[in-house]
C-alpha cells in the first residue's frame, strides 16, 4: 500500500510486483522478467531488519524465491544500484540523514546487528545542500502521507542524481548499532 501512495504522490520508488507465494514459480519468473527485468530485490511483505531479503539475477532468482516459501506474500522490486542513504523523521520534523557503505552487497541483517560486518556510517551525508534538503523533504512527505507518528526511518538509494524511496520503517531499530540514535546524536 505504501508504494502505491508514493507513486500517486510522485515519490520515486522502484517498480514492483507483489505475488502470493502459492503461484507457480515459473509464472512469477516470467512476469518479473517481462515487467521489471533483472536484477531484482525479493523480500517478504511482512518482515523487518532485512530478514528474507535477496538481490537476485536471472540465474539465482528461483533458488532465492524458494527460500521465502514460508511467507504468504512476496514483494519483488527492480534493484536500484547507488548509494544507501537513510533519513530519520521525529514528530514531523527532519532529524537528519546518514549514508551507509556496507562491505556486503547491501545493508542486510548481519550488517545491521553485527559491528564486525564493517559497514561504514557516513554522517553528515556527502551530498550538496540542495540534495540533502531534497531527501529530507521526501522522507518527511512520505512520513506525513502515511500518517506516521513518532519516529520513522526512510531507506533511499541515490542513483544518477535521483532519490528512490525503497521503504519507510515505522519501527526503526533502537540498538547500539541502530541508525536513528546515531542520526539524533549527530544532530
Whereabouts are the PLM-identified features?
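Active-site nucleotide/adenylate-binding loops and adjacent lid/helix of ATP-dependent enzymes
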Residues: 1-82
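ATP-dependent carboxylate activation and anion-phosphoryl transfer catalytic cores
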Residues: 10, 128-187
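Generic secondary-structure signature for well-ordered alpha-helical cores
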Residues: 11, 37, 70, 102, ...
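A short acidic/small-residue loop/turn micro-motif
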Residues: 21, 102-103, 171-173
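Short, flexible turn/loop "capping" segments at secondary-structure junctions
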Residues: 44-46, 115-116, 176
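Short small-residue beta-strand/loop micro-motif enriched in glycine and branched aliphatics
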Residues: 50, 119-122, 176-180
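Phosphate-binding site of ATP-dependent enzymes
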Residues: 57-134, 158-164
